[in-house]
């Protein structure tokens, strides 16, 4: 974070643990970087009283960065297929 320009935005969608959140909060408060976009956190869900939640230059998502209309469609189609299979007591996707 110390090496970033003041105009930089930090984006993390991979692992929350790769960023020290206390250092990040300080950098945002002191305007050492312009902002942050996070989809992952050290502790999930992010606690309601976490300092990041109160910073105007922090965009926070609830770990949904992977979601697309196509993903949702596949997810719900498979969910219905799984439920129907369970209710009918039929095996699903048998591999031999």
Language-model features: locations:
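C-terminal helix-to-coil terminal segments
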Residues: 42-96
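Rossmann-like adenosine-cofactor binding region
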Residues: 1-51
């Amino acid at each position: 974070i110390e090496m970033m320009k003041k105009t930089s935005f930090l984006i993390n969608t991979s692992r929350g643990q790769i960023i020290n959140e206390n250092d990040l909060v300080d950098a945002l408060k002191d305007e050492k970087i312009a902002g942050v976009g996070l989809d992952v956190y050290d502790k999930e869900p992010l606690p309601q009283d976490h300092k990041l939640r109160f910073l105007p230059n922090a965009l926070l998502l609830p770990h949904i960065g992977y979601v697309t209309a196509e993903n949702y469609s596949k997810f719900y189609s498979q969910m219905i297929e799984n439920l129907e299979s369970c209710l009918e007591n039929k095996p699903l996707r048998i591999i031999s």
